[in-house]
A protein has these predicted regions:
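Helix-biased detector of long, well-ordered alpha-helical tracts
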Residues: 1-184
Length: 184
């Protein structure tokens, strides 16, 4: 099932396997947007310890688009899927007069062990990979809490560069500006 805040859905395939999928959309003029949608949907699965195996693609073009735009998107899609070992199971493309810019929707799919089965394999010392904003926040917390210890294992320039990643966080003053910007 899928909760409103989750990025992926799953369905029990058997007592020990779950079929899991995640979707992402991207819109704009650059054909490379397909790459980011694939990375997002496949990355959401990877963050749930699911090996993505395939993607399904739906593309909606403005009527003014030409065949070359589809070819460019397909070239980039093929490259990123080959690079990540993903099969392309379906590509559906169409144009509509109400579409102002290209919209690409990617659904990535994978199969994982049922969480009860998977938990049996977790042992002390297993590494955890944090991605996205959670990974950024977690990295910054580690640096703040264990900087002295980290300095014994990493170069000072690496520690300083990592600390500068704080600039990528959404800060309180930015959050407070959002209601003001929404009014204008």
């Amino acid at each position: 099932g899928k909760a409103a805040w989750e990025e992926s859905s799953s369905e029990l395939v058997s007592d020990d396997k779950d079929f899991v999928w995640s979707s992402a959309s991207a819109s704009g003029k650059a054909p490379a947007q397909v790459k980011y949608a694939v990375i997002k949907s496949a990355g959401d699965l990877a963050a749930k310890r699911v090996r993505p195996t395939a993607v399904s693609v739906q593309i909606l073009f403005p009527e003014s688009s030409d065949e070359q735009e589809l070819k460019n998107i397909m070239r980039i899609l093929t490259e990123i899927c080959e690079e990540t070992g993903l099969a392309i199971t379906c590509v559906q493309a169409e144009s509509a007069e109400y579409v102002l810019q290209t919209v690409i929707h990617i659904t990535a799919v994978g199969v994982k062990e049922n969480s009860k089965q998977q938990m049996k394999k977790w042992v002390s010392g297993t590494e955890i990979i944090l991605c996205g904003y959670t990974g950024l926040e977690g990295t910054l917390r580690l640096v703040e809490e264990a900087e002295a210890d980290l300095r014994t294992r990493f170069t000072p320039s690496f520690i300083e560069k990592t600390k500068r990643c704080k600039e990528s966080l959404i800060l309180p003053k930015q959050i407070l500006k959002l209601p003001e910007e929404a009014k204008s």
